[in-house]
Structures are given as structure tokens and as C-alpha cells.
Amino acid sequence: MKKILFLLGCMSLLSFIITPKVYAGEAFSLPDNSVVYDIDQGGSQQFEVEDDLGRPYIITIEEETQLLMMASSVKNGTYKITKERPLQWKASYKIDVSSNKITRAHSASATAITGSFKSTSLRVDSPTQATYYLKRTLLLVESSINLRAKLSNGNIVVTY
């Protein structure tokens, strides 16, 4: 009985060691501090992440519902990008996507529960990238927050 348990243990250990692992990053490389929204899956996708200092954030990407859906491309539409530091602040904006290009960034919003936002700026940096730049002040300390959405390989890559 001990031999059988030993063999089963060895076999399961080997299966973990030799099993090939496929990572999403193999298809394309991701920048640090990024999450990937699968446009084909659609809907609302939420990610609980931490920055380099271990501070928690919630990143949410939502597909806006449209009354007239165009049959030509499921990738066309409006997507809301949100970054939130729970109990401290929340920032969001929307991007319009058409023919795998960001045609417009709009509806920027920033709410501070603690501290305040000194400045905010929403820009379409290129046909495939939009960034929301924010400067936040808390107890005389200023910090920069960037929330970038980039179209890549049929996905929206959000860098926080």
C-alpha cells in the first residue's frame, strides 16, 4: 500500500513538472502593470491588481450596450475603462472603437474620496492608444496616475 501511494505521489508530482504551461503573454508581450480585456468575450471584465508597491486597485473594462449593433464587426463599440483605488479615488473614461482603431476618447471622470485631483487630461495618443493623465494631491504630496488603453491583437490592453 505504501508503494502504491509513493508511486501515485511521484506520478502526480511529475505531471506538474512536465505539463507544458501556455501563458497569454506568449501571444504578445504585455507591458508591466497591464491587464487584457478580451473584446470577443465582451461584457464587463474586472481585475483586482496591485502596483509595484503592493497597493490594491480595481480595473474594470465594460462594453457599452448599443441599440443598433453592426453585424460587420463585434469589435466596433464603446468601452468604459475604470481604475479605482478603493475608498480613495476612482477615474474612468470611454473609448469608441471602429475598424480596430480608437476613434474617440470621451466622458472622462475623476472622483477623489481623499485628497483631490489637481489636473486631468484625456488624449488619443495614436489610432490604437488613448491615455487618461491625472495628477492627484494628498497631504501636499502630488502623484501621477496614468490609465492607458491600447488596442492589440483583438484585445484592449489596459496599463495602470
Model regions: which residues?
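N-terminal prepro-regions of secreted/extracellular proteins
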Residues: 1-84
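Mature secreted bioactive peptide module from preproproteins
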Residues: 64-160
